[in-house]
């Protein structure tokens, strides 16, 4: 016979006629060892010792089979009632509506053949046993259906209240589908049902249920922890938001400009398409629920309630794990929760003080945004993540599926982040005591500012680039940031060896796997890169988007436009009329600084082909970008637009071109319906200030004079730019006013840099954790633009090679690294899986011998991360760096910076600092005692340092990386108003047109926008400031990534449209 396919133990065959002998009953299988996959609690059911039998064969009649299963169901239900009654498990007394299928019963009867009498003996035994059980037990005369009793009681005892059983309709539909299959009616005969089976089941269930009842958490904790479940989360947040409404004066939530955003609804967080259906959830969806819940907490709970809840949970978890014995994991978990409690209690009053004075630094009551608010908001996000993780631990710590090591790593990472945020809060307090009311930037003399920065930049940063990467941003942006960080550290591993070229990108593909699976390694390597690699590395990394393959993919996903042409503006002087007297003219000279006269590149983008854009003169200026095949028919030219947008791209003055920003510029051209010309200015450090300003001003004046060639009449002109481009937009307008020529009708600057001084501000403190704008990177870009960045020796070697030499060299390096990189990638993973336990590292005190130099110069040099993977087995029996605490990552290298040849080789690859660097760059500590000494005195002439007033017993974590290449003193040129417009005199700022600023609440450059808007407002200049929430610096380049970035980009379009709209005529 063909055996029927297995079914769930909750399957039922039901009937609704009183005369029928078939009632609700389960079908059991005799193989107790078989794993059930249809029901989540089947594994626990096997642990109870319940035998799971298969259904009877169809050799008996339908009525006899029904009687047998009815008696078996009655016996099982009566037994479970007896067991569950003393344990106070609720037994449902109502049944769901049942349905009968007559055709199925007739089919089952017709299929029964000879041999029906084989079940008489078993049936008599069951009847005898049923009578015995019925006389021995007391219960209702008509017990409820056995399946409902068993399923409900076992689900409550084993699965908990959060696991739901299949509905009755689903069971009936499944029964119909299986009964309609003729092969499903053939089952093997159950023989030899033992009469003592009931007693075995009784003892097994009773022992397991009593043990489970003892392990149930207390009722008060069950009530408190219910809010972390998916079904009750929304109700909790809604109730908390109603009971604890946010105070308007508190400003704990930075208001954005996106009205469709509803933070309290954690199911509608952006980037995931709204609420997920109840039921099956993948790992990604669970991860999303974790992030969304923490984000919802940070927006729905006030600071005091959040801190008190976190402290209560930390104390409970600490007491629990302290009582779990001398295990290493339990001890570390207890210490982590003790640290969480200490840091939360110490941070809460400081944040409250910052919130109490934050409103004095806002632009106005309609725009409550500044660095102090952003710092408090970031700390609240960290507290919210710790609160959610603590609740998860408290509710799952008794489960056999609780991953102690994973949760320990998460908690240690966020505890390190909370410790550093507490240090930033004290730094912000220090700024409050030094600065005047309403001033966000450090106002002390330059020596005090350098001393303040010197203490700040020594803080540990790696914890913010591992597991905690981007915790302050919207959940939809975090996967991108993780991908970016993995690519960055992989790219940085091979940059110094390969210098430049395609080989760096190819080699990084083989090493990114380690950083993807080990967040601690990624954070440590990220910190090493941002502190030691020069501006040429960032220029090479940011220019990856300029690769033809990536730019082509981006263009395929962007809007299709009729015109996208690169123009080369000739370096020829021309005349421009003065605005005060059009009869008079002024000569606009071509750019001359540093490199002499040269053409200026600009890209013309237009959604429609307009008059003038296909003229012979413009075609003569077009620069070829490679062959293109145009298959579409030549469109009819549209009339000239009344407006024109002149765009200046960002990139820290050192990287990117208009090609990188082309995707969102095409969208602008479509939505605005105007031509856009984007200027490709020369980049630093090869062309420092004022070369970029001269080229942008020259291109702007050329566009105003030749607007007819660009498809516009030039009635309304808008200057638009982001980041460094926003700075250039403002300075170009200042230069146009100084020349007396036409200034634009308005400026739209997105997250601009308005001062390039090395001054501390509350928002710039956030650069400690920002993956896109670390403080050292900002300093290197400023140094490159101001002309103080020195050129490395390998740059001169590249110039000597020439273009063809670079191509030949990069090709050979690519082929070599393709082979060696694959070998290194395979070896690194083979070492992880096949490393011998007796392998020991070099002793910490052993120095390198001269014979070891050959190994240090091998072509495939091992990095810091590879050396970390080769660490010996520790107390926990692991050989991976991710099992170490963040504290170990912070201080392990202080005592012995060269613990292994690989470490020494890595530092040698980065390039040690020369003695001349010591006077201008920070030293790295060699011991913990030296670090403590630096907290009290300055290394410069022994002058007492200006440092944050840390309370007794609090010591932030210091970086263990090498020399930080960041100048302590700003070059005097950065005070030039054409470089730092925030420092411009009032008479210059009064010449600016209306300025519309769009900033990010979590951007280190937020205070630049706030202070510049305050200055313009105090002068009576028209200015607007819009602040968007939860987005990083550079959201325009991420416009296609998620809903928030698209809405923020649309806000910039609205500001431009406002500028291009002619003012209404006054009423007469």
UniProtKB/Swiss-Prot annotation:
Residues 1-76, 91-195, 236-278, 836-862, 890-913 are annotated as: Disordered. Residues 180-195, 892-913 have a biased composition (Polar residues). Its main location: membrane. The modification Phosphoserine is found at residues 863, 865, 906, 927, 938, 959-960. Rapidly activated by cAMP-dependent phosphorylation under the influence of catecholamines. Dephosphorylation and inactivation are controlled by insulin. cAMP stimulates its retinyl ester hydrolase activity. The keyword Hydrolase applies. It is an enzyme of class 3 (hydrolase). The modification Phosphothreonine is found at residue 1068. One of its GO terms (biological process) is female pregnancy. Phosphorylation by AMPK reduces its translocation towards the lipid droplets. Monomer and homodimer. Interacts with CAVIN1 in the adipocyte cytoplasm. Interacts with PLIN5. This is Hormone-sensitive lipase. It comes from Rattus norvegicus. The lineage of its organism: Eukaryota, Metazoa, Chordata, Craniata, Vertebrata. The gene is Lipe.
């Amino acid at each position: 016979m063909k055996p029927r396919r297995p079914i769930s133990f909750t399957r039922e065959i039901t009937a609704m006629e009183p005369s029928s002998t078939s009632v609700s009953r389960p079908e059991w299988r005799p193989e107790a060892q078989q794993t059930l996959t249809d029901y989540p609690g089947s594994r626990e059911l096997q642990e109870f010792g319940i035998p799971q039998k298969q259904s009877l064969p169809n050799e008996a009649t339908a009525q006899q089979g029904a009687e047998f299963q009815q008696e078996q169901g009655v016996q099982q239900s009566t037994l479970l009632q007896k067991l569950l009654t003393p344990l106070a498990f609720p037994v449902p007394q109502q049944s769901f509506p049942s349905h009968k299928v007559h055709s199925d019963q007739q089919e089952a009867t017709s299929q029964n053949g000879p041999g029906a009498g084989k079940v008489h003996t078993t049936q008599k035994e069951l009847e005898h046993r049923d009578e015995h059980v019925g006389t021995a037990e007391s219960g209702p005369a008509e017990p409820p259906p056995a399946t409902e009793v068993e399923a409900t009681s076992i689900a409550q005892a084993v699965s908990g209240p959060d696991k739901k059983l299949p509905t009755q309709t689903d069971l009936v539909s499944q029964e119909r589908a299986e009964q309609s299959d003729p092969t499903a009616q053939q089952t093997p005969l159950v023989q030899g049902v033992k009469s003592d089976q009931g007693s075995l089941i009784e003892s097994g269930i009773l022992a397991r249920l009593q043990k489970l009842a003892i392990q149930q958490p207390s009722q008060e904790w069950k009530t408190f922890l219910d809010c972390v479940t998916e079904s009750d989360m929304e109700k909790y947040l809604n109730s908390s938001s109603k009971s604890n409404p946010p105070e308007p004066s508190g400003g704990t939530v930075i208001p954005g400009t996106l009205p469709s955003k509803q933070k309290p609804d954690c199911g509608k967080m952006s980037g995931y398409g709204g609420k997920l259906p109840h039921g099956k959830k993948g790992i990604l969806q669970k991860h999303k629920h974790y992030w969304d819940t923490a984000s919802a907490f940070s927006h729905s709970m006030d600071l005091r309630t959040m801190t008190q809840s976190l402290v209560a949970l930390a104390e409970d978890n600490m007491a629990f794990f302290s009582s779990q014995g001398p295990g290493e994991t339990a001890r570390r978990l207890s210490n982590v929760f003790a640290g969480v409690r200490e840091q939360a209690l110490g941070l809460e009053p400081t944040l409250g003080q910052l919130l109490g004075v934050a409103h004095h630094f806002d632009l106005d009551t309609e725009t409550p945004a500044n660095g102090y608010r952003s710092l408090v908001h970031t700390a609240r996000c960290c507290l919210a993540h710790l609160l959610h993780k603590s609740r998860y631990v408290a509710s799952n710590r008794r489960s056999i599926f609780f991953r102690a090591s994973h949760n320990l790593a998460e908690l240690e990472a966020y505890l390190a982040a909370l410790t550093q945020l507490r240090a930033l809060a004290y730094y912000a307090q220090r700024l409050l005591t030094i600065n005047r009311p309403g001033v966000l930037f450090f106002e002390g003399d330059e020596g005090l500012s350098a001393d303040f920065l010197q203490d700040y930049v020594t803080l540990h940063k790696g914890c913010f680039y591992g597991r905690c990467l981007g915790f302050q941003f919207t959940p939809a942006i975090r996967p991108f940031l993780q991908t970016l960080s993995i690519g960055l550290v992989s790219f940085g591993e091979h940059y110094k060896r390969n210098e430049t070229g395609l080989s760096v990108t190819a080699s990084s593909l083989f090493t990114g796997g380690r950083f993807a699976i080990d967040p601690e390694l990624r954070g440590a390597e990220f910190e090493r890169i941002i502190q030691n690699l020069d501006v040429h590395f960032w220029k090479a990394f940011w220019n990856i988007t300029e690769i033809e393959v990536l730019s082509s993919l981006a263009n395929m996903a962007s809007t299709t436009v009729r015109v996208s042409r690169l123009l080369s503006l000739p370096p020829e002087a021309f005349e421009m009329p003065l605005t005060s007297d059009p009869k008079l003219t002024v000569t606009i000279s071509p750019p001359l600084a540093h490199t002499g006269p040269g053409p200026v590149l600009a890209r013309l983008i237009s959604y429609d082909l307009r008059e003038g854009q296909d003229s012979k003169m413009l075609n003569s200026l077009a620069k070829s970008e490679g062959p293109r095949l145009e298959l579409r028919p030549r469109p009819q030219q549209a009339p000239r637009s009344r407006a024109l947008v002149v765009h200046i791209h960002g990139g820290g003055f050192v990287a990117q071109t208009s090609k990188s920003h082309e995707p969102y510029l095409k969208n602008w051209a479509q939505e605005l319906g105007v031509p856009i010309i984007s200027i490709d200015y020369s980049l630093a450090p090869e062309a420092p200030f004022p070369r970029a300003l001269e080229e942008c001003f020259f291109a702007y004046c050329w566009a105003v004079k030749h607007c007819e060639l660009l498809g516009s009449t030039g009635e309304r002109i808008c200057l638009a730019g982001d980041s460094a481009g926003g700075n250039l937009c403002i300075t170009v307008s200042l230069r146009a006013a100084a020349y007396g020529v036409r200034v634009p009708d308005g400026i739209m600057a997105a997250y601009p840099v308005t001062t390039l001084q090395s001054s501390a501000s509350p928002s710039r403190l956030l650069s400690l954790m920002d993956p896109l704008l670390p403080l050292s990177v900002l300093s290197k870009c400023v140094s490159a633009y101001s002309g103080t960045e020195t050129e490395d020796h390998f740059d001169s070697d590249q110039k000597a090679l020439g273009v063809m030499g670079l191509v030949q060299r990069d090709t050979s390096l690519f082929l070599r690294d393709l082979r060696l990189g694959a070998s290194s990638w395979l070896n690194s993973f083979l070492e992880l899986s096949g490393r011998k336990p007796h392998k020991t590292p070099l002793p910490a005190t052993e120095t390198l011998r001269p014979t070891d130099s050959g190994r240090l110069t091998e072509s495939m040099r091992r990095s810091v991360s590879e050396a970390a993977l080769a660490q010996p087995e520790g107390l926990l029996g692991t050989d991976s760096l991710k099992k170490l605490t963040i504290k170990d990552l912070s201080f392990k290298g202080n005592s012995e910076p060269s613990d292994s040849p690989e470490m020494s080789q890595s530092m040698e690859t980065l390039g040690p600092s020369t003695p001349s660097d010591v006077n201008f760059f920070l030293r790295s500590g060699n011991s913990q005692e030296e670090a403590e000494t630096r907290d009290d005195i300055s290394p410069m002439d022994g002058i007492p340092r200006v440092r944050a007033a840390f309370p007794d017993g609090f010591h932030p974590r210091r970086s263990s990386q090498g020399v930080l290449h960041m100048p302590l003193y700003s070059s005097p040129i950065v005070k030039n108003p054409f470089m730092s417009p925030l420092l411009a005199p009032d008479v210059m700022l009064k010449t600016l047109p209306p300025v519309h600023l769009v900033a990010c609440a979590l951007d280190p450059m937020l205070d630049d926008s706030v202070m510049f808007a305050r200055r313009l407002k105090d002068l009576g200049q028209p200015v607007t400031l819009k602040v968007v929430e939860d987005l990083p610096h550079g959201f325009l380049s991420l416009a296609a990534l998620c809903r928030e970035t698209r809405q923020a980009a649309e806000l910039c379009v609205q500001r431009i449209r406002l500028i291009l709209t002619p003012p209404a005529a006054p009423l007469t």
